[in-house]
């Protein structure tokens, strides 16, 4: 995808320098456009069917967005996203509040968390979280390389969880 976690991206044409800062730009969505975009996520995961490509791990529907003047926008071309937007998991309407409460609880005990908020586009609720693998400076953004423990330990993603042979806490430290 054009917008993968960290500093990895796949391009059909000439690759861009992923270490450079890029001016944040994108198409700002109206509330109605945002609601439609969110509601289409289960049918078009990871921007399938558009000229955008992104890669976000996990089973939950989500999309990568940029914030422009406190408005949600779809990033232009290969511009790194600033935030991840997640609707509720279908059939589990409280997942948005659950994620919000868990992160705020972590913050209360001194764990640093990214900026988060619960938003609403017409009748559609969403959870918005700022990306930790980005650096923003003077209105420009760049990707920060990161790896999860499976990547760092050369463990296939099929063994993501400890119960399936993935890394345990002892191996992480």
Question: What are these model-predicted stretches?
Answer:
Residues 1-173:
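Phosphate/dinucleotide-binding and metal-coordinating scaffold of catalytic cores
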């Amino acid at each position: 995808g054009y917008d993968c976690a960290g500093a990895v991206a796949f391009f059909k044409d000439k690759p861009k320098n992923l270490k450079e800062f890029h001016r944040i730009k994108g198409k700002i969505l109206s509330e109605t456009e945002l609601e439609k975009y969110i509601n289409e996520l289960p049918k078009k995961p990871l921007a399938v069917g558009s000229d955008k490509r992104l890669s976000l791990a996990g089973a939950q529907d989500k999309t990568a967005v940029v914030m422009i003047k406190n408005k949600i926008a779809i990033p232009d071309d290969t511009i790194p996203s600033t935030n991840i937007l997640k609707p509720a998991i279908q059939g589990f309407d409280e997942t948005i509040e659950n994620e919000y409460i868990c992160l705020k609880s972590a913050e209360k005990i001194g764990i640093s968390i990214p900026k988060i908020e619960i938003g609403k586009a017409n009748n559609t609720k969403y959870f918005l979280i700022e990306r930790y693998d980005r650096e923003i400076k003077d209105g420009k953004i760049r990707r920060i390389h990161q790896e999860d423990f499976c990547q760092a330990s050369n463990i296939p993603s099929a063994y993501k969880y400890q119960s399936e042979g993935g890394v345990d806490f002892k191996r992480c430290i």
